[in-house]
Amino acid sequence: MTQLNTPVARVSDPGHRPTPPPSVPRRRRPIRGTRRAFWLFVGPFFTGLLIFSIIALFWGFYLSFTRAVATISPTEFVWFDNYVSLLTDPSFLSSLLSFTVFAILVVPTTLLVSLVLAMLVANLPVARAFFRSVFFLPTAFSYVIASLIWKLGIFSGSPSSVANTVLSSVGLPPIDAWLTQSPYYWVVIVTVRLWLQVGFYMLLFIAGLQRIPDTLYEAAAIDGLSRGPRRFFAITWPQLRPTTAAVLLLLLVAAFQAFDEFYNLVRTIPSARPPLLYIYNLSFQQLDYGKGSAGAFVVTAVVVLVALLQSRFFGFGAADEAKKPRRGARKERAS
């Protein structure tokens, strides 16, 4: 008899499943037109940025070293004469003093009020989203509209205005010079700026409060540190240091950019003009574009200097640096 060489099928375990062969990942082909679509969306933005920001920045820097009166085409290269004339102009120095007073009044007030509101809203048992929306809503208002409301309705100087009605209700005489005399116009300017921007910085502090681990408060409660000022200064305030530094920097930059409320409320008072209003009058009323460009770069240099000093003394990322182990500690752990 002859044996047929037929393959014998292997009997496999019924519970065993054969392993499928490894699948080779397929390369995804790039979608056609992706690069073209990218430039179609981003191209107009970069074109506007190049024309209205970058080229304008370099052209303004060039104008600051030239004499350009009633024309943007320079007629004479004067080197640093515009800067010297600007820094020796009493009106410009008075505008820097106005900014200093405004910053001293509005920056700490906004910081304190926004921090207090953030802690109150963050600790509410209910309706947190509602109160966040209520306090944030004024940031959507225009500075021009808010200034007109303050000027025509709240601090108009008439006996029927809101401010004078409140003063009369508590037995105080009404004030007619809200918008013409110091320190009354500072009350008007600071309150309108406070109403417009405190909600935004409140949200920043709420975000900082939400980043604080609950374990820190639990450990403090175990150690006997109850709610109150001691726990705030021991735990909350150090953890909010990076957020506070960012808020301070944003407030200082916003104070330097103050223009709308001053222009609509006290533009006729020379002693209440901030640097931007002085540069506006210099460039668009006196038509001295060379000196106006020099003023813009002087203000920019002051903003950068103040920001560097603020970050140097208060510090960004101080909490992150504190969390990093020192080199000596690393060596001890390694040994």
Q: Where are each of the predicted segments found?
A:
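Short, intrinsically disordered terminal tails adjacent to the first/last structured region
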Residues: 1-25, 325-335
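Gly/Trp-centered helix-boundary motif
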Residues: 3, 29-30, 59
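Low-complexity, intrinsically disordered short peptide segments enriched in small/polar/basic residues
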Residues: 5-8, 21, 28, 39, ...
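Cytosolic juxtamembrane amphipathic/interface segments immediately preceding
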Residues: 26-30, 34
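A structural signal for multi-pass alpha-helical bundles of membrane permease subunits
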Residues: 34-327, 332-335
